[in-house]
Every structure is written in structure tokens, then in C-alpha cells.
């Protein structure tokens, strides 16, 4: 018999070790796959049902056309439903409002909270501006109506009288939407009792928390927080992280859940990646020239929101653009609140393409002191004429949901990074594409560099996030210089002052005095237009069109590309609503089809239009059929 050959002990041990290592590798790979699958399941987008929302809220969202929750909603809603304090930071347009409204309403749906009769609202929602107050109130009222539940929400502003506030709160609403300045006024007037608020308040929401302190609401917030019970759930919503948010967090919250969320591929970007950011270097005197080139040569996409820092500059810009046939509307804190809301509604509805918004909070202290000094001098010269008081609660960059704004232009630069982020956040909302163009003068360059360095990521510090605007050549700008400078000289301080007064007189018609009339006759309100010319003299006809010899070839090609992109998006409507050849034909057809002329007693649908030499329609018909 043959002897079996035995392997050395060392060979056997090495084979065993190899097999064990292979088995361990297989086990590790399997564990890695399981972990990846679990992670994918956790990261997979959840539905509103999976978040534990009430079926009535889900039906309401379906009616509003909202099918899936955003990332901030997926993360925040479960924690809020559990009753935890939450600090949530997410970019503008990411759905923060619904992230707190949905769980807030669900908690108020419960039988316990509805059955108990309370002497004060159960939920306070505090926002920085009246415009945002109106927006949040409209959203929560819409959800309540669609859910068909017995809940009531009211909005209060500091301009309301004590009797108006008392009437608004007479129905014992569950939700109060207000600015921080209004709450202490309610306490002082006896409209709200601090003890009743302390007993009833269960949820406090601070929306746009990064702006509440920076715009002077600290004392108001301290008076509110002093009566907040410890059991009250507090929510802070913010677009940026700042020392003010940290200050509020320490002041109000107890062991909060901190959510800092960005969308896929967004990393820590403060401005959404779907917003392209550009800049143009020019002198302060040449800003009018450059904005004329941008708008008149059509190298930026409509609708356009233009930010300026002073009211006078806004009117100067409007008058300047009017001379070239460019209609625009103005939004500032000097206008009555109803007018401001109506301007926003018309702009969102697409009745005009250019809105000039005053962000006077972007002024530096020095600029504000200088403006105040000039105003005092003016008042001393003419005591009879006093300037209208500005609304301290006006804010156009603070969370306002502008619809389908494709381009934001910073005619004047904001004085802070936060201000820049909030301005740019007015475009690119709900994941749509957008762009921004900033006009930078030498005096603004230092602040601009601070903004650029803040936005630059740690990994890509050498890459400029804000790039030079490529579609406007120097030749294209210079070709318009003579016209622009000539027109700019005609827009004097006197013309600006007169147009400012005229605009205010025009907008008074939307004030509280006529509010009841417009509520009963809403069609009358639709007839009001906010982009009407303010200049007393009609613009020169030759300024409306640019001769071909002045247009730069490269810029003309860029303009064609922008128009093609606009057509692809279905945004081909001209500002002012319609117009053009088709509308003219419609007018002619209406004028030509007089029913008295076209009526035929024989029953023919075609009347006697076009009859000649006494021939009737039947003979004409016979001639045609032969």
C-alpha cells in the first residue's frame, strides 16, 4: 500500500490562517453591505405618512400640490411631534415654514388641547416683518381651512389700535402670528394678560431667528420670554448661523435638538447651488449705466428683483428706467401696508417684471446718521412738509416668498454676509434655478471680499463662487454711456422728491380707509397698477429702442440665448400683460362683429357683413358654391 504524504505543520497552519482570513473578509463585506442597506433605508426620502402626520394634514397638502416632504421637514417634524425644543438651520426656500406649521397644527388637533378653554392663544409665531407675518398667517389659515378643523389663527401688528387687537382676540384663537414688538403692546393695553399667556402657551416659534435680534427686537423678546412657562415647547428657524441665534438659544430653549441641514451635493453652502452668482465692478456713478445695459440688452432673465439701500435711490432708479421705456414698481417701508401687500401679490402674479425693493436695514450706522441729519435739515427748512414715517416692521428680504424670481440684482450691496444671503435667497426657491448680479463700487469692495471669503468652502478656497458677469461686454456698456449719462442728469433731487410724494399719494388709495371698499369690490383693486410712470414728462420715443449700430455683437448673441432660455421655460409673456399683434386682432374682431349688423332673420350664422351692391347673403352663398 502506498503511504500518504503528510504536509508539513507549517503549511497546514498557513492554509488555516488563509481560510480564516477569507472568512473574516466575507463576514466584513456582508456586515458592510447590511450597514449600507440600513443607511440607505434611513436616508431614503420619507413620506408625510411615515412622519406620523394626521390624515387631514396630508389631504390638505395634497390639495396644495405638495406630495413629498423636504429634508428639513423630514428631520424636524418627528422631533417637534415628540415635544422637543428644536433649532433648525436650512437654506431659504427649503420649506422651514411647513416644517413647524404641520406639527404645530397636529398638536392642536388633539382632543385635549381643543377641549380646554383657554384665555390666551396656545401657540405664538413671531416673525421679523409684517410681510412675513402676512405670509405665515395666509399659509396657516389655508391649512386650517383645507383640514376643516375648529381652529382659529389671527395676525397682529404693532400699528393696530388696542380695540382692533381686542376684537381680533375676542374669538379666543389658538394661534397668534405677530411681530415681537406687538406682544408687549398687547400686555400694556390689557389686550393680553401675562398670567393667561403663561397658563395657555404651549408652543413658541421664532421664525427667521437670525434676524429677530439684529433688527432691534431684543427688548421685546425679553419681555415675552419672561412669561414663557418652562413646559412650553420652543422652536427656532433660521437660514444662517449667527451669534444672535446662539443668544436666543440660551435665552429661551432647554436642551434643544440642533438640526443643521443641507440638500444633497450642497454640503455647507449658505446659498443654494442652483443659484449662479455674478458681479460687475463699476464706479458708483456708473451703476445706472450698467443696470440699463443689463435690462435693456436683455442679458438677464425676468422676473427681476432689484435691491437698493435708500428710498431716494429707489425712486431715482425708477425715474431713470422710465425714460428708457422700462416699467417698474417700488416697494419700501414708506408705503401703506395694504399697498405693500398688493404690490407683492401683483409681482408674484406676474403683472410686472421689475420690482425695486428698498432694504434700508442694509445701511450702515454712518449712512443712517447722515440720512437722519439731512432729513432734519430738510424739516427745518420747511416745517409744513414732513416726511412720512417709515414702518419699522417692514422687511422685504426676511423670508418673503417671491414667486418665480429668476434674477436678483444688488444695485447697492448689503453691509453684512447675512443680508447678502437673504437677498440672494429670494431666487432659486423650491429647487428652481436662479441667478444674482451684484454691482460693486470701489467703496463696497472690502465688504464684498468678506462675503466672498465667507462663501468660499474650506476645500475650494481658490475657487471663486461669485464670478465676473460674462454676458455684458465693455463695448456694449460704453455704447449706452452717452444716453445714460444724459438721462441721469435730468433725474434731479427735486424730481426724486416730487415723484416720491406722488407715489405715496397714489398708494394711499390702498390704505385702511378704503380697505372695506376693496374687500367688497375686489375687481377695483385689480385695476390698480403699481408700475405706472411717475415722471411728469413723457419719455423720448427714441430712447425706448436701441439702434442696431449701438448693440455689441457678443452681447446681442447672449441676449438671444437668454430669450431662448426664457421661451424654453414658458416665460414669454411681455410685462404689462399681453399686448402685441394677437391682442390687436382680437380688438378689431370685437369691433367688427357688431351683433346688429351680423343678425340674419333667415337663420344663417353668417350675417350681412361685407355685402355690396345690394346683394344678400344667400346670393353670395350660391355664387360661392357654383
Curated annotation (Swiss-Prot):
Q: Where is the signal peptide, in residue numbers?
A: none
**Family annotation (InterPro entries):** DEAD/DEAH_box_helicase_dom, DEAD_box_RNA_helicase, Helicase_ATP-bd, Helicase_C-like, P-loop_NTPase, RNA_helicase_DEAD_Q_motif
Pfam families per the record? DEAD, Helicase_C
Q: Biased-composition ranges for Basic and acidic residues?
A: 363-381
Q: Kindly state which keywords UniProt assigns to this record, in alphabetical order.
A: ATP-binding, Coiled coil, Helicase, Hydrolase, Nucleotide-binding, RNA-binding
Residue span of motif DEAD box: 207-210
Segment Disordered: which positions? 1-48, 363-388, 568-626
Transmembrane stretches, by residue range?
Answer: none
Report the top EC class in one word: hydrolase
Q: Where is the Helicase ATP-binding domain?
A: 77-259
Q: Catalysed reaction per UniProt?
A: ATP + H2O = ADP + phosphate + H(+)
Its EC number is 3.6.4.13
Question: Which parts of the chain are coiled coil?
Answer: 9-47, 356-385
Q: Where is this motif: Q motif?
A: 46-74
Compositional bias segments (type: Acidic residues): 12-27
Residues that, per the record, bind ATP = 90-97
Q: What Gene Ontology molecular function terms does this protein carry?
A: ATP binding; ATP hydrolysis activity; mRNA binding; RNA helicase activity
Domain Helicase C-terminal positions? 293-477
* Comment on protein domains: The Q motif is unique to and characteristic of the DEAD box family of RNA helicases and controls ATP binding and hydrolysis.
Which family does the entry's similarity section mention? Belongs to the DEAD box helicase family. DDX56/DBP9 subfamily.
Protein name in UniProt:
DEAD-box ATP-dependent RNA helicase 16
Which gene name does the record give?
RH16
